[in-house]
């Protein structure tokens, strides 16, 4: 008999709406044994009704993450095979339409696999396993990926701090096959991009900004572009291909800026009008403001400012400050493309923060377009937390 996690009265409502998380403070008791980290458990309402089947995480505030809401569905190799097949099938049209050789294959909870992120870069699959359930099924997951994607190497980038909340150490290394020499070259929308899955951020690259890079390219022809927190320079790469008059790529990492140069070269683009600036963006923006320097288009794609609710107020102040300074650097009628990748920063709150920045900058701002993560990063209707990337196109007068 399966171990059963009984909820407190009234705590079943979120699971009835198919939200996949069970918090520790909602659990009444555990029956049928003592589950170990990653074990599969059944979750029942206080009145005994079966609700879902998930993975036990004893050290996390989220103590169960639901694998399935189907009582007849076992959690085994076939389960993972079905989830992977469904995820790939749901992305086939996008892959064909945009000519993708790099895309998100598995988007964790939004693809029914909590804590599991898998990105494909050409013939390399990069996995991030963030909780005890994912950890427990690592070998099975690798076996199923190898069966469905023969010829692909499988590499793990679970070198993230969030694993500490699960009592797990960071892990990085080859899981299957032979890793090719870095960088890997992927393509999107006819543009080639160099990706280092070993040393790069996250799993190697920010696939979620693909659609937004294309949006940015619509505004840059003949314009001066400041690309902040540029990483490997792909907003600048799209801008160069779209005919920007000048581009300044700014990042604190010399390695990232070298890859930005390489990206221009592998696309056969002249970068004589491109400046690569190794600097702290916050300090540089203030310096440029003091010098009276201006631009036609600015891209602000900063790192996450808030990891938990206690940091949200500080994050709002940070976003407001950096957007205010960016607005002060824009020529009248200029375009600001600004982003937040903090899941706690809801879309309406982010827009309010940017509107407040406009007031402080004493600039009139029109919101032209809202942006979000690319469609290979879907958002489950039952899991709004999956909507993490928010962006705004703002015209600044």
UniProtKB/Swiss-Prot annotation:
Domain of life: Bacteria
GO CC list: cytoplasm
Domain PUA stretches: 2-80
Main location: cytoplasm
Reactions this protein catalyses: cytidine(1962) in 23S rRNA + S-adenosyl-L-methionine = 5-methylcytidine(1962) in 23S rRNA + S-adenosyl-L-homocysteine + H(+)
InterPro entries according to UniProt: PUA (IPR002478), PUA-like_sf (IPR015947), PUA_sf (IPR036974), RLMI (IPR023542), RlmI-like_PUA (IPR041532), SAM-dep_methyl-trfase (IPR019614), SAM-dependent_MTases_sf (IPR029063)
Residues making up the signal peptide according to the UniProt record: none
Keyword terms of this UniProt record: Cytoplasm, Methyltransferase, RNA-binding, rRNA processing, S-adenosyl-L-methionine, Transferase
A GO molecular-function descriptor: rRNA (cytosine) methyltransferase activity
Pfam families, A to Z: Methyltrans_SAM (PF10672), PUA_3 (PF17785)
SMART domains membership: PUA (SM00359)
PANTHER family (UniProt xref): RIBOSOMAL RNA LARGE SUBUNIT METHYLTRANSFERASE (PTHR42873), S-ADENOSYLMETHIONINE-DEPENDENT METHYLTRANSFERASE DOMAIN-CONTAINING PROTEIN (PTHR42873:SF1)
Protein name: Ribosomal RNA large subunit methyltransferase I
Organism: Shewanella denitrificans (strain OS217 / ATCC BAA-1090 / DSM 15013)
């Amino acid at each position: 008999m399966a171990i059963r996690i009984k909820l407190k009265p009234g705590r079943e409502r979120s699971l009835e709406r198919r939200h996949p998380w069970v918090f520790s403070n909602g659990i009444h008791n555990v029956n049928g044994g003592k589950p170990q980290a990653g074990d599969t458990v059944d979750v029942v309402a206080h009145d005994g009704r079966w609700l879902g089947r998930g993975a036990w995480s004893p050290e996390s505030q989220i103590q169960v993450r639901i694998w399935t809401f189907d009582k007849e569905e076992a959690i085994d190799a076939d389960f993972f095979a079905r989830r992977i097949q469904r995820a790939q099938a749901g992305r086939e049209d996008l892959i064909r339409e945009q000519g993708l050789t790099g895309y998100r294959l598995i988007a964790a909870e939004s693809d029914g696999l909590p804590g599991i992120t898998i990105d494909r870069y050409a013939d390399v699959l990069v996995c991030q396993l963030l909780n005890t359930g994912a950890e427990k099924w690592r070998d099975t997951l690798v076996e199923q990926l190898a069966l469905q994607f023969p010829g692909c190497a499988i590499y793990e980038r679970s070198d993230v701090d969030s694993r500490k909340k699960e009592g797990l150490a960071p892990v990085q290394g080859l899981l299957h096959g032979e890793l090719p020499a870095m960088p890997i070259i992927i393509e999107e929308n006819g543009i080639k991009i160099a990706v280092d899955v070993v040393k790069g951020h996250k799993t190697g690259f920010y696939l979620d900004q693909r659609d937004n890079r294309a949006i940015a390219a619509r505004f840059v022809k003949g314009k001066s572009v400041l690309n902040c927190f540029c990483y490997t320079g792909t907003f600048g790469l799209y801008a160069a291909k779209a005919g920007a008059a000048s581009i300044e790529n700014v990042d604190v990492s010399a390695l990232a800026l070298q890859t930005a140069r390489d990206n221009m070269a592998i696309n056969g683009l002249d970068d004589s009008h491109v400046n690569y600036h190794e600097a702290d963006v916050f300090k540089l923006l203030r310096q440029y403001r003091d010098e009276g320097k201006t631009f036609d288009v600015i891209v602000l794609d900063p790192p996450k400012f808030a990891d938990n609710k206690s940091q949200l107020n500080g994050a709002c102040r940070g976003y407001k400050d950096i957007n205010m300074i960016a607005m002060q650097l824009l020529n009248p009628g200029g375009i600001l493309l600004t982003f937040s990748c903090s899941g706690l920063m809801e879309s309406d709150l982010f827009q309010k923060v940017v509107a407040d920045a406009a007031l402080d900058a004493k600039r009139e701002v029109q919101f032209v377009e809202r942006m979000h993560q690319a469609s290979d990063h879907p958002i489950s209707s039952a899991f709004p937390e999956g909507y993490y990337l928010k962006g705004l196109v703002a015209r600044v007068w």
